[in-house]
Amino acid sequence: MSEASSKNLSETLFQNHKQAKETSSLTQYMPSSLELLDTRREQSSQAWYRNLRRLQWIWQGVDPVEQEEILARIASSKHSRTHDEWLDTVMGYRSGNWTYEWTRVGMLHQKQAAERQGEEAADQMFAAALYYSIAGYPHLRNDNLALQAQVLANNAYQEAAKLTGFVVKRLEFSYQNKKIAGYLHLRNTDSPKPVVLVSAGLDSLQTDMWRLFRDYLAKRDIAMLTIDMPSLGASSHWPLTEDSSCLHQAVLNQLADLPWVDHFRIGLIGFRFGGNAMARLAFLESDKVKACVSLGAPIHDIFTSPNKLAAMPKMYLDVLASRLGKNVVDVRSLSGQLMAWSLKVQGFMSGRRTKTPILALGLEGDPVSPYSDNQLVALFSQGGQAKKVKSKTISQGYEQSLDLAINWLEDELCK
């Protein structure tokens, strides 16, 4: 896509959204829940509605200096905010608005891609796709600005796929009379590759995973197939239920039809909620899956602790409500409903162990994925392991976790 056509597309997408509803105001709550959230916001020292994933975004390919410049522009904006306490709630598509600022820098990377050749151009275009995706974060279903940013992210990713020397194929898989869209990434097509099915979670898009392939899997000649979680991105037309692995299971059962991958050597990687889905799939399809890695996955504890769920930041509650298709949210009722999502409550961790070895990784002190959850996964997995990444090394936490995970996965897939 040329710089001019990119600019025209963005202007077309966003021109009617100067007064678009701001992300933090989209989810409607029952009066009692709203009172709880308002009180908590006023008493909190948290300055942002969104959970700022600075380290994760840097790992995924965001320039750390650019990131701080973007956040500084948002923080210093003089425009009206939905909530004065939260810096990232500037209303309308204008300077200081979250989507506006991330999209603007995404366009700069797209411009740089047009000025470069080969892999350098591809890297800039993949970066543009990542910035556009973060512009839509946390991807609430009725967030018009986020949906427009998602269009830009998908277009940029497809353009980047044409520029790179790696092979990136957009594939479709049949499920319930619809199509599941995913991207297959390969170092080359010389021979069928071991393949890793990847899920990025409930507030990240599959297009955020490029660096996982380029810097980790491609070097080991392992293919990567990405699929969005139900209710998100390319999978937005399926509701999210406690059957969290349904789409990935449907794709897994069609991998034998792909000539580029070795369907006898299939691995799984799931981040956050995607780890819940991947661990679940490792139990359901143990004959087909050789190894599974879950990173920071909620497995049991948070789903069976209503008070912990109710105390989560509003962004997380908004995301859960959005994925479940809730129009009006009662926090207590939502907490009760999510008990069914515990893999232990579903019966996976109370009987026979899965033959698939699972490596369950978590950050020390993580309330969403406590060490007890990872121990539970390892206990009911033959050859399973639970690992804790020390919080004092959080700046290297993503690199350390992934080095550990990918080396382990490679060993298991190539046995």
UniProtKB/Swiss-Prot annotation:
This is Esterase FrsA. It catalyses: a carboxylic ester + H2O = an alcohol + a carboxylate + H(+). Belongs to the FrsA family. The keyword Hydrolase applies. Catalyzes the hydrolysis of esters. Transmembrane segments: none annotated. Keywords: Hydrolase, Serine esterase. It comes from Vibrio cholerae serotype O1 (strain ATCC 39315 / El Tor Inaba N16961). SUPFAM superfamilies: alpha/beta-Hydrolases.
